[in-house]
């Protein structure tokens, strides 16, 4: 389809002539035949989207929520190679669906920017954007997080010595910090499926 611009993060440019140019970028392959005034997306039958994270619905295996590299967060809920619905723009980050109550779904953009759905993914709104005390971004660019569907808690990487905990994600609750010197930022989480309140953490250094 035609559009007035293509995605800015380009990886390669091929000049066919002075007006016809092929570009590859985070959105796939684009062609301009008028020197860059308009672009046509050339992604038919090509898989060009990279998912950072996906979450699967507990009762509908065709329903997937996923954050993609520079292409937003998408909801896919039909079998096969069908078009999905972009539920949030920008860079997509970690995605979560509450396995106990799937009305609660979460996605993220960059750093501590988290958005939430309370109606099963039909709509999303901004939920949390925690920053350092000086207002700078906290955590990683694509920031790891996890939810505990039993206790309705969310854990988010903050810095090398603390993990942010949202105590009750069913509402706009206060957060606190789990202060532990990890040596490096937390990059992976796993909520114990056996013992309530137990969280396993992996870090950038092991």
Annotated model-derived regions:
Residues 27-30, 69-72, 110-115, 159-164, ...:
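Loop/turn residues immediately N-terminal
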Residues 9, 25, 50, 91-92, ...:
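Beta-rich catalytic cores
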Residues 12-15, 51-55, 94, 144, ...:
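Conserved beta-strand position repeated once per blade in WD40 beta-propeller domains
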Residues 20-22, 30, 63-65, 104-107, ...:
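Conserved beta-propeller blade signature
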Residues 2-7:
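Short, small-residue-biased leader/transition segments that mark boundaries at the very start
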Residues 1, 24, 32-33, 76, ...:
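Conserved Ser/Thr-centered positions that define the repeating blades of beta-propeller domains
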Residues 43-46, 86-89, 135-137, 179-183:
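Surface loop/turn motifs at the tips and blade-to-blade linkers of beta-strand repeat domains
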Residues 15-18, 58-61, 99-102, 147-151, ...:
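Residue-level detector of Asp-centered blade-edge/turn motifs that repeat once per structural unit
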């Amino acid at each position: 389809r035609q559009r007035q611009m293509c995605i800015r993060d380009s990886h390669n440019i091929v000049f066919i002539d002075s007006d016809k140019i092929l570009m590859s970028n985070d959105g796939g392959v684009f062609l301009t035949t008028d020197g860059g005034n308009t672009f046509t997306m050339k992604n038919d039958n090509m898989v060009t989207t990279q998912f950072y994270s996906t979450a699967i619905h507990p009762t509908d295996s065709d329903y997937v929520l996923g954050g993609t590299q520079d292409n937003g967060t998408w909801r896919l809920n039909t079998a096969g190679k069908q078009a999905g619905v972009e539920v949030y723009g920008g860079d997509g980050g970690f995605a979560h669906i509450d396995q106990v109550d799937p009305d609660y779904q979460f996605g993220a953009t960059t750093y501590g920017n988290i958005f939430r759905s309370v109606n099963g993914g039909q709509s999303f709104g901004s939920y949390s954007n925690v920053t350092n005390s000086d207002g700078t971004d906290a955590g990683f660019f694509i920031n790891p997080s996890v939810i505990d569907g039993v206790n309705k808690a969310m854990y988010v990487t903050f810095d090398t010595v603390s993990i942010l905990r949202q105590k009750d994600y069913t509402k706009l609750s206060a957060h606190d910090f789990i202060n532990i010197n990890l040596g490096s930022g937390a990059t992976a989480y796993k909520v114990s499926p056996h013992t309530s309140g137990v969280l396993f953490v992996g870090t950038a250094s092991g």
